[in-house]
Amino acid sequence: MKNIRNFSIIAHIDHGKSTLSDRIIQICGGLSDREMEAQVLDSMDLERERGITIKAQSVTLDYKASDGETYQLNFIDTPGHVDFSYEVSRSLAACEGALLVVDAGQGVEAQTLANCYTAMEMDLEVVPVLNKIDLPAADPERVAEEIEDIVGIDATEAVRCSAKTGVGVQDVLERLVRDIPPPEGDPEGPLQALIIDSWFDNYLGVVSLIRIKNGTLRKGDKVKVMSTGQTYNADRLGIFTPKQVDRTELKCGEVGWLVCAIKDIHGAPVGDTLTLARNPAEKALPGFKKVKPQVYAGLFPVSSDDYEAFRDALGKLSLNDASLFYEPESSSALGFGFRCGFLGLLHMEIIQERLEREYDLDLITTAPTVVYEVETTSREVIYVDSPSKLPAVNNIYELREPIAECHMLLPQAYLGNVITLCVEKRGVQTNMVYHGNQVALTYEIPMAEVVLDFFDRLKSTSRGYASLDYNFKRFQASDMVRVDVLINGERVDALALITHRDNSQNRGRELVEKMKDLIPRQQFDIAIQAAIGTHIIARSTVKQLRKNVLAKCYGGDISRKKKLLQKQKEGKKRMKQIGNVELPQEAFLAILHVGKDNK
């Protein structure tokens, strides 16, 4: 056991985690040169296209160190986006140390800090690594100082490397073996294995990624899931070298995968503990704290025949993604679907794309909303995650919206722009600290504003230099109203949105104008109105198409023309009474863009 090293690679987006993993795999000979490709661990097509890591991946390698010993390295490549930070915290729970990768050109950014603090809270050994030293803009001295100033760990000895060219990666491995402690645990004790991640394989059923904390797991053992008490046979187990390799046993301190022919998706939840049926452990390992979704949206299949397939797909996906929450929902405009909870907008986009790609579904998404806390006049507190569930105005005593605490790191030059943006988003400044050339800003901003487009606007006002990390702080009373959309006098539930009273006029007007452009003209007038309660705040009309009934009249009597026009008018009136308005998919997406700048 003293030769096992478990570690994660953590860093801000694009600081070179995945490339460094590639080099480590290459040096340790996990894959032959022929099988090697860039970002070997980003196995999902989506990850490759967007150039981001979404799922944490684990690899087991053997490294022959300069002291002549052979070490077993179990390492996990983690995502950098704030939406996937729960993946990072789960990966860290399986490790004794972390490589903190910092771009020697960019310096410390918000995610670097957030991930590093997560690692420190879990008492992990953090090893700083300065990456990209081959860049002309690299300034390792300055960045090392920044790490000490802002993060507070000693970086004078930080390893310098370039994952792209491979310079210094050997030193990273040597430092790892030296600084990261070996796992603790009792190989002879009762088995305790933590489920770090799981996914669904069409042939094998549920595959779980586990870290053995105590004891040993052998092939053919009967294992018991601590939370449900279910027992299963350990059919196959092994490690990733990134390829799946079968082994006969997993020893104490190792990280590997396990297949137990579990068909039920919720059979082995992530964060649970496995133990042996014949010699069970006394208590379960401390799991992970459940992540609360921050953003909710309705997802509906375009054709209602896909509903069953959609439900199965969500089940399989939620196994792989512990933070995805879903419950059935029906809408009068869109039929049956699900209300899903996500960690942020990027997460929502990714899930939607994965459903459309991997499971071949066509989906309509309604506007994302955050969770509001509502105290009704009868003093009961309810949580509302969709505008249609909001009680009537006269039944609400107080409506509270979620406030996010946002930590931003940016160069001083952009401070003015960023503060203006935060104020516009109804933010309140709580802290501001100068570190050399960088400023650390802390603002409390309503979650609804952060979720809408705050990140994009922050990047554009600071030319991409500012970075953001946010988390939920509390609920706070606020003057929020629901804006309904009426089409020919009928409410369309899927188009409602909750917004602050100050913005409601503008949002309503903007939404109505957008809808006017998107709804195709029909044989009768379509009135589009935005209303708060019974009070109409905006209106526009999609004009009818009409045939020129007078084309056949040459000269002739005025009464003849009047008769024809009158007849057409009555026809249109009848049509309007029975006519239905078909809303195109774009109309539902229009709400996503309300309140965003059209620059």
Swiss-Prot record:
Location within or outside the cell: Cell inner membrane
Topology term for the membrane: Peripheral membrane protein
The keyword Cell membrane belongs to this UniProt entry's keyword annotation: yes
UniProt domain tr-type G: residue ranges: 2-184
Residues that, per the record, bind GTP: D14, H15, G16, K17, S18, T19, N131, K132, I133, D134
Keyword GTP-binding: yes
Origin superkingdom: Bacteria
The family this protein is said to belong to: Belongs to the TRAFAC class translation factor GTPase superfamily. Classic translation factor GTPase family. LepA subfamily.
NCBIfam families referenced in this protein's UniProt entry, alphabetically: lepA (TIGR01393), small_GTP (TIGR00231)
Database matches in HAMAP family: LepA (MF_00071)
Protein name: Elongation factor 4
Originating organism: Escherichia coli O8 (strain IAI1)
